[in-house]
Amino acid sequence: MSTLINGTSLGNLLIVTGSFILLLLLVKKFAWSQLAAIFKAREEKIAKDIDDAENSRQNAQVLENKRQVELNQAKDEAAQIIDNAKETGKAQESKIITEAHEEAGRLKDKANQDIATSKAEALSSVKADVADLSVLLAEKIMAKNLDKTAQGDLIDSYLDKLGDA
């Protein structure tokens, strides 16, 4: 009985081994090329995806660098615009101050001329009034033949009138 078991086991082993080898030969003949093609296609797809991802990363890096350069240029341009505006403002400030000083000088000169004209007119008017009063005083003195005290009082009276005028 033990030879039967050993013989059966050996027979089973030979049948299973033969079946396995036959299966491998059939798979190699009919399916191996298709399986290899599937694995090759999968490998190529994964490699392509990795390359695409690397290219996308590089493009993103280039784009980021370009955006950073543009941002820096925009900042520099904004700073330049601000500096130009400050310079323009200072120039306008200086111009306005200069014009204001010139206008103040013109107004001062005109006021001085007006004052001089008014003074000249006032002096002319006073001279005319003094001349008229002097003539009037002389006429009264001649007409009245006054003593020295009366003449002094009369002159003081006319001078007071002149001071009021």
UniProtKB/Swiss-Prot annotation:
Looking at the record's lineage, which domain of life comes first? Bacteria
Cite the Pfam families for this sequence: ATP-synt_B (PF00430)
- Enumerate the subcellular locations listed in this protein's record, separating them with semicolons: Cell membrane
GO function terms (MF aspect) = proton-transporting ATP synthase activity, rotational mechanism; proton-transporting ATPase activity, rotational mechanism
Q: Where are the transmembrane segments?
A: 7-27
Quaternary context: F-type ATPases have 2 components, F(1) - the catalytic core - and F(0) - the membrane proton channel. F(1) has five subunits: alpha(3), beta(3), gamma(1), delta(1), epsilon(1). F(0) has three main subunits: a(1), b(2) and c(10-14). The alpha and beta chains form an alternating ring which encloses part of the gamma chain. F(1) is attached to F(0) by a central stalk formed by the gamma and epsilon chains, while a peripheral stalk is formed by the delta and b chains.
| The protein, known as | ATP synthase subunit b
Q: Which organism is it from?
A: Streptococcus mutans serotype c (strain ATCC 700610 / UA159)
Gene name in the database record: atpF
